[in-house]
């Protein structure tokens, strides 16, 4: 009967071994990855349990990739790249689709020309599309520097109807159409691209030309070239600027409606308006380059994109031969008048 006992022992050992092999598989089943998500909050704590009283087991930061293992009401159990597991509020997470959309937005606009540098007034989210309720992932801190690429408009988030003021007619007609807000497509210092509310960004215009805004809003500006200036024995190079402006209102049907060129007077050591043009139905981006003009030499050139009455976008080329700005017409091109235009 000893052989029978030996068989029983072997069977028992095989059963124990099989159970041990199944345990990790069961563990993997309980902690299988449901999906991948990304942290949209500036920072969030991971807790050991979904309860009023909990222990913090770790922290995650904005943009961090996590694996979602489980979901329970408002919370998701996640695992970080370092293997830490814990519960986090689901509102602090966005899905892979949002991450991929921002990656595509970055790739599609990685070579777009910068229209102006900007500085953020407050902490601001990078949105996938213009709009306060659209998906977002990365958050930029107040004071962060960004490069402005494009402009779009989006309907302002609707709220409660305002209470009529005393003395106003209750039967007055509501304003026509939705209220629109301006949004900038920006690139941050890490190369990430997204949409931000324009009022959250200050265009970082040099003070020397910002003082000539005359109540208008700077949309973009560019240094066309530099000139040598000698002021009381102090030699320096001074940039000459193309500035693109518009009325200080959101929701306009154009990106800009006026341009000005500021050149430096080397005798009076100050900026002067060399050229200005109004009445444009302008569309970003504006392009800056250089071109050879035979006897005039190699001159700075800027190209504006302007809509005509039919809504077709046409390019207009201009050259600066300090202090004169002139339109450069293509063979057979007939200039069109946009509105008031003068030098001064």
PLM region descriptions:
Residues 2-13:
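Bacterial N-terminal signal peptides that target proteins for export
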Residues 22-25:
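C-terminal motif of bacterial Sec signal peptides marking the signal peptidase cleavage site
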Residues 27-41, 67, 79-118, 160-237, ...:
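Boundary regions of SH3-family modules and the immediately adjacent low-complexity/disordered segments
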Residues 33-34, 48-71, 128-151, 157:
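SH3/SH3-like (including bacterial SH3b) beta-barrel domains
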Residues 46-49, 114, 121, 125-129, ...:
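Core beta-strand residues in small-molecule sensory/regulatory alpha/beta domains
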Residues 75, 181-183, 301:
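Short, conserved beta-strand segments of beta-strand-rich sandwich/propeller modules, principally
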Residues 238-252, 297-308:
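Short beta-strand elements that form the blades of beta-propeller/WD-repeat-like
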Residues 286, 290-344:
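Non-catalytic C-terminal interaction regions
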